[in-house]
């Protein structure tokens, strides 16, 4: 069984737009470290790693709570238990493609609710139930990273969440 090594970082971005003229932007980087993976089908290396911070998005305390969240350049598939698998792809310099899949849940006012997501073009739109205090998009399961077997080097995949 072949194994390969690479350094991987998951870049998580949250973009909150409060008005047409003012924007609040925050970004955090989660470093997954040097990773080893299993070669699948002689073409893809699969790596499973748990992000250090499970919170992908948290609504700002000073801003109005959103009615929906938009994840740019992503795909969504339903998962059991009211969760959704969100996959984000990143083009690589050698014309290959890396992807990360996160099993996500939606927390509204501290309680887990069923995540309702739909595909809208290249984006995923998550409908948020009415909330009083806070909204969180989180992943409590390990992330699955897939890269071409020929790829070597650092890797950053941006997960951009807008409200």
From Swiss-Prot:
Organism expressing this protein natively: Escherichia coli
Q: Which Pfam families match?
A: DUF5462
Q: What is this protein called?
A: K88 minor fimbrial subunit FaeF
Protein localization: Fimbrium
In the record, which residues are listed under signal peptide?
A: 1-22
Q: Which key words are in the record?
A: Fimbrium, Plasmid, Signal
User: What's this chain's function?
Assistant: K88 minor fimbrial subunit, plays an essential role in the biogenesis of the K88 fimbriae. required at some step in the initiation and/or elongation of the K88 fimbriae.
Gene Ontology cellular-component annotations: pilus
Q: InterPro entries given for it?
A: FaeF (IPR035191)
